[in-house]
Each structure stands twice: as C-alpha cells, then as structure tokens.
C-alpha cells in the first residue's frame, strides 16, 4: 500500500548515501528476520540518575602500523589496524543491536528523499516503509511518502495522547536562509537520518509504538483527512490543569524527579558546550583544509624549476594532497555524524524537562484538591473521587517516567558509546592515512644523493 499526504507535484529523486532500502531486509515472517542498525538498547537496568558510565567494550588484540607497536598513555595496547579494517570494533559493537532486532516485530525505515516543485512551494518528501507482524496492522508491509510537517503532526499527537511519556525530538524545522541550503544533498541526508531515528525510537517503545496516530502515520493513504481532526479532549484537559494549578506552588516534589531535572540541566549544558566547541573545530579544520589545498601545489610548481629535486618535491605535493583528502573525510564525518547526535540529545533533554513540568502540574492539582478536601474532612468521612483520580494520575505519571528514564539512559549509553567509538575510529583512520602518506616519501628522500 502506498500513499502521500501532500499535493501532487513532480517529484525528483535526490541522491543519498543512506542505509539500505527496507526492501533489502527480510520480512519478520521469514526464517531470518532483518535487524535494524538502530535497535533500542535493552537489558541493562540502569539507575535513574547516573554519571554516564562507559560499558565495557569488546577486547581486541593489538596490531601494528609500519612494524611499530603503539600503546595508550596508561599502557593499554591500542588497536592500530589498517584503515580498511579499523571499523571492526564498530562492527562488533553492533552485534548486540542485530541480536536485539531478532525479537522485534515492527521495522520502520525512512529513505528515498524526493524534491517536489509546486507553484506555491517546494518541499522534500521521504519514503516511510514498514514491515510488521503485529495484528494491529491489516497488512504486513506498507510504503507511504511523508514530508516534514507530517512528522511534526505525529509528534504533536503523541504529546497530546501520551503526556506521561518522553517523546523523541525531531530535527529543527527552521534553517537560516543563505547559510544552510535545505535542498542540498548534505542537509537532506542529515534530516533523513534524524527522521529515521525519530521513527525507530517510537517503533522500539513499548507504549508509543501502539499509539493509533503512529499506526495512521505509517499506513494512511491520505494523511490530510486525519490531520484535519480537531484538538483532542485530552489536550483540552491538559490546558485546564495548567489553568487550575498556575498559581499553586508544588510542596512535596519527589527528590528523584528533582534530581532528574538537575541532571538534565547539567547534561544539556555540557552538550551545548561540546556543540559550540565542535563547531569551532570544524570551522578551523575547513580553514586549515583550504590552506593545505594551496600549500601542496606550491611544491609541484617548485619541482619544475629544480631538476635535481623534482621527484622529492612532487612526492611532498602528493603527500599533502593525500592529507587533504583524509582531513576532508574527517571533517565531513564530524559534521554529518557527530554533530547531529549531540543536537538530538540537546533537544531530547529539553523535551524531557517539558514532560517533567507536566508531571509537576498533575501533582500540583492533586495537592491542591487534597488540601481542599482536608478542609472539608469534618463534613465527609470518605476521600472525594476526584482526589483519588488525581492520585492515580500522579502514580501513573511517576511509573511511566521512571520506565522511560531507564530506557532513555540505556539508549543514551549505547548511542554515545557508538558515537565516541566512531569518533575514535575516524581519527585513527585519518592519522593512519597521514602517517602512510608521509612515510611513503621517506625512501624517496633518502635515495636522493647529494650531487658531487
């Protein structure tokens, strides 16, 4: 089944270096179910508040580069495999994801971005492919096209109908015109990855994945008819709670949730600092890259004037060129893989703090009604029904938030472990390539004898 919620326009395929199409993954009904690269972390029962511990990584045997054994400052042998095989650590790190994927029953992938040019607007749509064995779906496979505003609609609906859960963030909608080209291949691919991660987080959630709006988003041929529905009753009730408790100061906030809020404030602050510094590093690397591109050809031009030094100078020029290529790859990886994860978790922390404020509002409503009931306790012997309902809401909120916090901490540990392993892997490759380039011209320089 296929569908689109956007006006009919002429789509144009955009190049993408994204993941494999979902059609290349075996269906869960087959003998060997496919596994997603971004499966949610499971198993570890982390505490609600942690100092971001680093799980043990797989042990690897040290290898050598140019017959030299390297070691870390603490004496631990370092893995110095060649660039062609230096990603083996990441491959082993993802084994847990693959095994976890075998137990899943809902697979969602965002790919195949296309540009639509209409009279009034130009926009990008993405293919959202679904494979599932769940009985809530009429068919085992779906494929629909969605644009960014459709993802935004889904997230708003999840916030309205699942107020006690952390909703994954979407990538920023607005970009600065003239600074970022929102139709460029790089921007579209970065957004595609973020949207894919957004849907995968929802699909992996034991509650959000069963939300009716998520089902509609994945399957509806015409999403516009569903988007036109009015504000839900639950949303209106939420507004009423905020109005009733706007002047009430919370008295007995659980210490664990106060600690969570403090942790998220510090976490977002640290990530914000990393984000700003990383942007400066990327800027400096780009400037350095531009200088290198001018630096290398100078030796090549010089070699034409020096017959005796022709080969060594050409070698240095080629070496600088190889270093340029390696640095360009390192910078692109930092921009396209490292930065989006940092920004996602900054947005995630802000979203989580919003949910915690909603929890406080529900507790404030409960405390206000409890105090009002206590003043009338002489007139009635039983606790009013509305007070009991408020108490149930608070307990439900607390239970859901604790479960989601544990899940978020597990996902965060896995995401940052993979992120930092990727950073280490890319830096190893960069320095290996530079080392190989410079070592390759040493024999050329040594063989060049001084003229007699």
Swiss-Prot record:
Record has Protein transport as a keyword: yes
Cross-referenced InterPro entries: AH/BAR_dom_sf, BAR_dom, PX_dom, PX_dom_sf, SNX30_BAR
KW Transport (keyword) present: yes
Residue intervals of the PX domain: 104-225
UniProt superkingdom: Eukaryota
SUPFAM superfamilies: BAR/IMD domain-like, PX domain
Name of the featured protein: Sorting nexin-30
GO cellular component: early endosome; phagophore assembly site
Entry's family note: Belongs to the sorting nexin family.
Biased composition (Low complexity): 76-90
Organism lineage string: Eukaryota, Metazoa, Chordata, Craniata, Vertebrata
């Amino acid at each position: 089944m296929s569908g689109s919620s956007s006006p009919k326009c002429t789509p144009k395929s955009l190049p993408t270096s994204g993941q494999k199409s979902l059609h290349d993954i075996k269906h869960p009904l087959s003998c060997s179910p496919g596994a997603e690269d971004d499966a949610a972390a499971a198993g570890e029962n982390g505490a609600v508040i942690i100092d971001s511990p680093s799980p043990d990584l797989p042990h690897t045997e040290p290898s050598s580069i140019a017959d030299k054994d390297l070691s870390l400052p603490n004496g631990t042998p370092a893995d110095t495999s060649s660039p062609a095989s230096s990603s083996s650590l990441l491959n082993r790190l993802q084994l847990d994801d693959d095994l976890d994927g075998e137990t899943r029953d809902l697979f969602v992938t965002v790919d195949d971005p296309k540009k639509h040019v209409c009279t009034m607007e130009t926009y990008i749509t993405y293919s959202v492919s679904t494979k599932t064995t769940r009985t809530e779906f009429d068919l085992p496979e779906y494929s629909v096209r969605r644009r960014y505003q459709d993802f935004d609609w889904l997230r708003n609906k999840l916030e309205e109908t699942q107020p006690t859960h952390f909703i994954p963030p979407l990538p920023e909608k607005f970009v600065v015109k003239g600074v970022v080209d929102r139709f460029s291949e790089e921007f579209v691919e970065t957004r595609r990855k973020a949207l894919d991660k957004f849907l995968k987080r929802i699909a992996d959630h034991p509650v959000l994945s069963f939300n009716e709006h998520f089902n509609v988003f994945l399957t509806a041929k015409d999403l516009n008819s569903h988007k036109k529905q009015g504000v839900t009753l639950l949303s209106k009730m939420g507004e009423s709670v905020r109005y009733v408790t706007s002047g009430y100061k919370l008295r007995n906030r659980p210490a664990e949730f106060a600690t969570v809020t403090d942790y998220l404030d510090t976490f977002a602050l640290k990530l914000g600092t990393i984000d700003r510094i990383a942007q400066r590093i990327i800027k400096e690397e780009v400037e350095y890259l531009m200088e290198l591109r001018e630096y290398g050809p100078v030796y090549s031009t010089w070699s034409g004037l020096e017959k005796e030094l022709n080969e060594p100078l050409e070698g240095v020029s080629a070496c600088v060129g190889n270093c340029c290529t390696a640095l360009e790859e390192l910078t692109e990886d930092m921009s396209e893989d490292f930065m989006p994860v940092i920004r996602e978790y900054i947005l995630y922390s802000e979203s989580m703090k919003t949910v915690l404020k909603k929890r406080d509002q529900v507790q404030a409503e409960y405390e206000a009604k409890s105090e009002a009931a206590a003043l009338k306790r002489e007139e009635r012997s039983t606790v009013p029904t509305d007070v009991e309902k408020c108490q149930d809401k608070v307990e439900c909120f607390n239970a859901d938030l604790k479960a989601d916090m544990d899940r978020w901490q597990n996902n965060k540990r896995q995401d940052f472990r993979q992120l930092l392993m990727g950073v280490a892997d890319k830096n190893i490759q960069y320095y290996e390539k530079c080392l190989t380039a410079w070592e390759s011209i040493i024999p050329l320089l040594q063989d060049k004898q001084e003229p007699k």
